[in-house]
């Protein structure tokens, strides 16, 4: 696997239509059908971190005397192609369309419902 160049403005950065704070639905994998909010986007790896999705458990040993071991659950990232933006009003997942508004600003909207995202 080639190394990922994480410098700003590099050609390896992938333009994603998903942003932090969007509500998304998982369309494939073990959590298929679940919805959650995007906590973080990783554009150089084309991955997203979604709240409550793709959780893994880790058993942590005690590091000091008198401390007990614990089990931690943590969200891991998903590939951006495995999620779609979810409309909470219409209860449907849809592709995203970027268009230029009358005032010249770029906006995002859902293709199925026409709902504006931002």
From Swiss-Prot:
An individual GO BP term: translation
Parts of the chain that traverse the membrane: none
Signal peptide range: none
InterPro entries in the record: KOW, Rib_uL2_dom2, Ribosomal_uL24, Ribosomal_uL24_CS, Ribosomal_uL24_KOW, Translation_prot_SH3-like_sf
Domain of life, per lineage: Bacteria
GO terms under cellular component: ribonucleoprotein complex; ribosome
Gene3D superfamilies in the record: 2.30.30.30
Keywords, comma-separated and alphabetical: Ribonucleoprotein, Ribosomal protein, RNA-binding, rRNA-binding
SUPFAM superfamilies cross-referenced by the UniProt entry: Translation proteins SH3-like domain
Single GO MF descriptor: rRNA binding
NCBIfam families: rplX_bact (TIGR01079)
Subunit relationships: Part of the 50S ribosomal subunit.
UniProt family annotation: Belongs to the universal ribosomal protein uL24 family.
Task of the protein: One of two assembly initiator proteins, it binds directly to the 5'-end of the 23S rRNA, where it nucleates assembly of the 50S subunit.
Protein name listed in UniProt: Large ribosomal subunit protein uL24
Organism: Prochlorococcus marinus (strain NATL2A)
Organism lineage string: Bacteria, Bacillati, Cyanobacteriota, Cyanophyceae, Synechococcales
Annotated gene: rplX
